[in-house]
Amino acid sequence: MELNSFDHKYVRILDIWGNTFEGLAVTFPAGYGLHVFDRDEESIRIEDYYIFASDIKEIKEIEVHGTVELASRWLTIRRYEQEDAKLIYEGLGRDEEMFRYTGWNPYATVEMAEETVREFIDSYNDPHFYGWALELEGILVGTIGAYDYDPESNSIEVGISIIRTFWGHGYATEALTAVLKYLTENEKIAHVTAGCASDNLGSRKAMEKAGMKLVRTEAGGLEVDGKVYDKLFFEYSGAEGEKE
């Protein structure tokens, strides 16, 4: 198996033991100096893992694009800019209602918002990082992202926040619909998941309207500030989502 043709390409590897590895490949010729493994053959490294040629059952180059600009009927779904941090803090971070059902606020201060946005921007080199600002006629109305990509199940989780001033206009459904389509059809991710508290009717309605299906309910599965909610799990699998 000629591994050097995959050097510095994004690949998915299935080894002979059934393990899956996915990421940017760096290849090494036989005899490169990996004698610590006592194996003189070609190898490939993905993150901290070395896989030798004879252990590879299947290797495939995959095309991923990461966070690209999308458009829907009313929204521009774009990459973050550092200038967004202050607007996100003012629109989301200062509004306790935004985190009523999560208890987690990464924008609680201007400094936290700036650091979070900076981390998002720094992550754009990762082809499986997906983070967007939602813009309506030049005005920031919310954020959406997908995270925790799992190559074993070819799945990812999606989350969205709309600034309260813009609730009730269908923007969450519109953004979700565009992102779900992009992730399954363009990125070929088979399963996109999401979760919310049972009392979070707005999120539930947006996910259902975007085509996500309720697949599981965990009784008492979410506790926020001493309040216990059932946790609802949703999933979307686009027609083009399954990988070969």
Task: Say what each PLM segment does.
Residues M1-V64:
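Conserved RNA-binding domains used in RNP assembly and mRNA/RNA metabolism
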Residues V64-L87, G91-E96, A133-E244:
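Acyl-donor (CoA/ACP) binding surface of acyl/acetyltransferases
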Residues E119-A133:
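A short helix-loop-beta-strand connector motif used in the catalytic cores of GNAT acetyltransferases and
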Residues E97-E119:
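Conserved GNAT-fold acetyl-CoA-binding loop/helix
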Residues K9, Y89, F129-Y130:
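Short loop/turn microsegments at loop-to-beta-strand junctions
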